[in-house]
């Protein structure tokens, strides 16, 4: 069994950069369905946001990697989040 880093508990952080508000959320999940449900919950909570940029890495070998740029230029939002998670070996 491979040892991997994961999120201990649900958390959030907020930062304001040049009048733009960025809010990050993380939550431990084991399946894509759990991740999708969490993403929908956040989208509903922030339905007035210009962009909601979800990303997920799931599996002990990081088998599932997915992200959306949600209207931002392709590869500029979701993909960097996945790269950060995988480089830190964070999954689930």
Predicted regions and their residues:
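N-terminal cationic and glycine-rich segments that engage phosphates or anionic surfaces
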Residues: 78
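Active-site beta-strand/loop microenvironment that shapes enzyme catalytic pockets
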Residues: 83-92
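C-terminal regulatory domains involved in ligand/effector binding and gene-expression control
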Residues: 1-75
